[in-house]
Amino acid sequence: MVHLRSIVAFIASVATVISPAAADGQGSFLWDPPYDNEANVYARVIELQHAGSSNGNLLATWEHWYANTTENAAYPNGTEGSFIIRESEDGGETWNTLTTIFDTQTGPGHPCARFWQPFFFEFPHQLGEYPEGTLLLVGNLVPSNKSFTEFFTWRSSDHGHTWDPVGAWQEGGTTRAGIWEPFLYLDRDGSLVAAFSDERNATAHSQMLVQVVSNDGGDTWGDVIPTVASDIQTDRPGMPTVTLMDNGEYLMAYEVCGRDPLNCPVYVKTSPDGITWEENDLGIAVVSEDGRYLGSSPYTLWDPSTKQLLLAAHNTWDSMTNAKTAEAQRSVYINKNYGVGNWSWAPSPWAVSYASSACNSNYSPHMLLRSNGTIRYTSPTSQGSSRYCAVRTGQAPIGVLPYVADFAANGQLGWINTGAAGKVAWSVSDDQYNFGKVGGSISALAITGSTGWTDYKISADAQIVGSNGTVGIVARVSQPKPGLDQFYGYTLAIESSTGNLTLYRNTDNAVGLVSMGFSGGIEPDIWYSISLAVEGSQLTAVLRSEYSDSNLTLTVHDENYSRGIAGLIGKVGRGSFRNVFIE
């Protein structure tokens, strides 16, 4: 049984229009569920690249089933599940449903109620008897009683419009004896590899990562080969994703559950050929320079245009306290050394809502590298305060310089608010980025860029709105937390109460480094151009008014912070920004 929310909502969901100027920073609907008991998570999106006139089109699908809301919402209500296939022909601005795939098998447990863990793969060249452009869709079919887990494949020869069942190719048992999360890629020799999680040898390994190889385009598969198998029986490496880097190495990212800390920290390791993984090597935990670590359901990709690894996951945690961080569920990790050494982080293109406990927001987020160099981020997100997940999507560059903010076109995509913990609203009107009233124990802090940035200049037009206020820009920010001045880094602020331009060092409080009055003072409702350049230990601040040719320049040396993210800040009153540029 499905619970219809409204006929209008269903009609609207058939062709979802995505506004590029969405000002709430929450992404835009890929799927607005018409039924209030729909479970929608684990979305996957692909851009067709071997499809002739269909090149550039996007295809998307996700886990789709119906929860038993009257007895146990974690279980299906008996209605068969499906994979809904949606297509966008305009880069993700609008989506239409192409078809819906059901379980056509018969026998005990079929048709399956759970359609879990889908994955698309487009053939870049002929594999077996199947030509370039052939599509595979694999998923994990699980019945209501979880009596088995089954990887099943469908094939499309018309770029996703129709799908033929290929069949089951791996069989697992019940929960704690099952198979999970298939991921397809090509190894160095061009063979098709499926990586997945395996509990079928639970007496030795509660869960391990394994792979199978196909040399005929997915018709048949070879033996199961372990790729990550811990010596500790209770360790549970899981949810593998793999990407090929431009040094020829393959990098695998995965969670490791079952050990302290209990947040399933993300690990990575590399292979020279995509097939040799040294199974007893558990890999390296992903930790940022400012002491954060990723936890649960990772997804990784290599961005050749910026030569950096990107890694998203369900959550981020403080490595000292194991508490969620201010940027939790809305950050992407970056590594510029092929997975070795330090990681930095950047805001995800948009921020999920976790208002509803019935939705596991940001679980297994998906990233797609677009042909235009931006990253499309797709994730489950709360739909209201009590309902299950919708699926939203949005795209933005991640950690790329130079950066020009186009608020009129992109809204808040690529920005997150960490200072006020949801107590202060940021909004977009035309080309302006605005924050509501702040003061007391909170500040409005919106950040963009990467904590790995070192030498750069941020400039913006800033305006105090109303009678009194303090607004400014920040640089080299790390470890942000909710509250007033709760971060490490530098702040450049204009203050109407003093008429000063002040440069601060922040160490979870603000310490003035240099301050000077501006000719004519700082007036509300007037635009001021401010910039802060950080180069080595030298900090250079510049201020000018839209009604004056006079400039005020402050220069100081400070060696406390060498890298960090950039952003905008409001400490008192209300404010607006425009013409934000980082170079």
Regions found by a protein language model. Give the residues of each.
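Secretory/extracellular carbohydrate-interaction modules
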Residues: 437-502
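Extracellular glycan-recognition surfaces and repeat-rich motifs
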Residues: 410-443
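Asp-box/BNR beta-propeller blade signature and adjacent active/binding-site loops
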Residues: 23-401
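Carbohydrate-binding surfaces in secreted/extracellular proteins
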Residues: 407, 460, 523-555
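Fungal secretory targeting signals
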Residues: 1-24
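Extracellular carbohydrate-recognition regions
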Residues: 24, 395-421
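Short, aromatic/His-centered strand-loop micro-motif at the edge of beta-sheets
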Residues: 507-529
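Flexible glycan-contacting loops in extracellular carbohydrate-active proteins
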Residues: 552-579
